[in-house]
C-alpha cells in the first residue's frame, strides 16, 4: 500500500509577491491555462489536488521571485500565506517556507527569524541568486547564522537567470528556446548545483557546520558529478583547506528532493552516493501534477530499489525529521 506523501517544493503566490515579480513573468505564468490561478489559490481546489496525489501534508512556498522582492513585500507575502493557511478548512494539511528578500542578507535573516518565531514557518525557500549573485560571500553569514540558530533548513530553489546570465543561452534558434535552456530546460538546475559547490569552496559549511541546505530536482545535477567534484576539490591546491571534505558535507549538510523528476534513472545514481535519509519526495506543484508524482512513486514501489521502510522514509519520514513536523497519516 502506497504510504502517505509529504511534499515540500509546492508553490504559491501571495498578492504582494505576485505584484512584485514584474509584468513579463506574470504574462509567462498566464500563458499556461490555469497555472496562475493554481498558484494564487490555497483553497479547496488545492486540497482536492493533494488528495488525488495521496499527499497528506504540503509545505507551501512562494515560487521564483525574479527581480528580488523588497523586505516589505516579503513580510506582507509571508503574513498573507500564514493567514490563508489558517483559513483553510483543514490547516493541519499545510506548513510553510518563508520568502526572503535575498538581495539584502540582513533583512533576510530578520524576516526568517520573524517567519519562524512568529508565524510558525519551518524554514525558507529562496531564489538561487540575486540578479546573478550567489550567497557565498561573508555578507550572507548573517542569514546562515540565523538559520542555524533557528535550526531550520534553507531550500535553494532555481530561478530565472539575470539578463547577463541569460545571454549565454541564446543561439541559432528562436528566443523562446534560449529562454527554456536558461530556465527549466537546463540552465537553472546546474546553477543551483554550482551554488552549493561555491558555498563549500568559500568555507560556508566550515563556519556553519550545522547549516541545513535542501536542493530539489534530484539534486540539481550534483549527484551525477559528485565523485568528480569531490576529487577536483582536493587537487591542484584544492578548494581550501576545508574542515571537512565535500563528501562529508554532502552527507551531513545537504538534503535533496525528487521534485518534478519523474524517472527512476537519476534516483538509481543517487542511491549509489547519497544516504536514503537525505532523500525526500516532492512534486513542484502546480508546475507538475500531484497525480504524475503519485504515478512515479508507485513505479518506485514496484521497482524494488527501496525496502518498505526506505519507501516510508522518502515518502514522509525524512521530511518530518528535518522539518520537525508530524503529518496526519490518514486524510
Swiss-Prot record:
One of its GO terms (cellular component) is cytoplasm. Induction: Expression is induced by an intimate physical interaction of the fungal mycelia with the bacterium Streptomyces hygroscopicus. Expression is repressed by VeA and MvlA via histone 3 acetylation by the SAGA/ADA complex. PANTHER family: 2-AMINO-3-CARBOXYLMUCONATE-6-SEMIALDEHYDE DECARBOXYLASE, AMIDOHYDROLASE-RELATED DOMAIN-CONTAINING PROTEIN-RELATED. Disruption phenotype: Fails to produce F9775 A and B, but accumulates gerfelin and continues to yield orsellinic acid. This is Decarboxylase orsB. Belongs to the metallo-dependent hydrolases superfamily. ACMSD family. Keywords: Decarboxylase, Lyase, Metal-binding, Zinc. SUPFAM superfamilies: Metallo-dependent hydrolases (SSF51556). Decarboxylase; part of the gene cluster that mediates the biosynthesis of orsellinic acid, as well as of the cathepsin K inhibitors F9775 A and F9775 B. The non-reducing polyketide synthase orsA produces orsellinic acid by condensing acetyl-CoA with 3 malonyl-CoA units. Further modifications by the decarboxylase orsB and the tyrosinase-like protein orsC lead to the production of F9775 A and F9775 B. The functions of orsD and orsE remain unclear since only orsB and orsC are required to convert orsellinic acid into F9775 A and F9775 B. The lineage of its organism: Eukaryota, Fungi, Dikarya, Ascomycota, Pezizomycotina. Zn(2+) binds at residues 11, 157, 284. GO terms for biological process: F-9775A biosynthetic process; F-9775B biosynthetic process; secondary metabolic process. Coiled coil: none annotated. InterPro entries: ACMSD, Amidohydro-rel, Metal_Hydrolase. Its EC number is 4.1.1.-. Gene3D superfamilies: Metal-dependent hydrolases (3.20.20.140). It holds the Pfam family Amidohydro_2. GO terms for molecular function: carboxy-lyase activity; hydrolase activity; metal ion binding. Pathway: Secondary metabolite biosynthesis. It is an enzyme of class 4 (lyase).
